[in-house]
Amino acid sequence: MTNPVAQQRTIDELLQKGVINLDKPAGPTSHEVAAWVKRILHIKKAGHIGTLDPKVTGVLPILLQDATRAVGALVNLPKEYVCVLHLHKTVPDPLVRDILREFTGVLYQRPPLKSAVRRQIRKREIYYIDVLERQGNDVLFKVGCEAGTYIRKLCHDVGEALGVGAHMQELRRTKAGPFDESKLSTLHDLTDAYHFWIEDHDEAPLRDIIMPVERALSHLPKIIIRDTAVDAICHGAQLAEPGVISLPDVDRKQLVGIYTARDEIVALGISVLQGGVIAKVKRVMMEPGTYPRYWKSRKIRKHEEGA
């Protein structure tokens, strides 16, 4: 019997392998928020994608249970933030906009003293910076950037470039990979939805919050495989050409998603595209035995050959 397709999974199945697009409140750490999600849903494991400092709010995707296997494919996704930059002295608006534009492209940053990681110089890319509004010495801007970019440090450097000094007043993450603010849920929403499911047997609110893990992996090139190849992949076998239904245009050594014809994620892999091997499995996402077994182990083959 095959897995239900992603959109038809039961609540229990979503709790086992789902993702929540959570609106992180100001105050707690990202780790604390993930721990609260575990307690609310009475599950054993939850992990977050991309760490937000305690005062920062916004998009914090939470992976549930088996979905945490996918975290390695998600931590380096591009991010977008909306930030309030406070200038320490008044600067003409055109100059502020010109200086901000100069920060697009590749930057070299050392994490700020308040960060939770080692303060080693890192290279990061700013994709775009757009000024949204200005009130006095407060500048509201939107920035799209590579994962691991420190917006606090960006604000400091902008102030230095302007010659007046500046700091980050407020920060909110508005995008993390395929997740944005269009379908955010709060911890309060999650608590209420779980209560409705347990007490009133109404699963609609919880189903509206927990998405299939495939939603988090929608950015990856998708290889579609035959049902006969699924269980072998679930046991860690390499994906060979005969097992492939559809192959996207990918480069070698690229991270890919390996899917069934029903759009269920089977595994994450690295494209090989050589010697009849299409991809090497990096992380199995589907439980073995979900699909019928069509392959034979080396031990069984040797036994049959010797019979």
Predicted regions mapped to residue ranges:
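RNA pseudouridine synthases
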Residues: 1-185
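Accessory RNA 3′-end/elbow-binding domains used by RNA modification enzymes
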Residues: 1-49, 121, 138, 161, ...
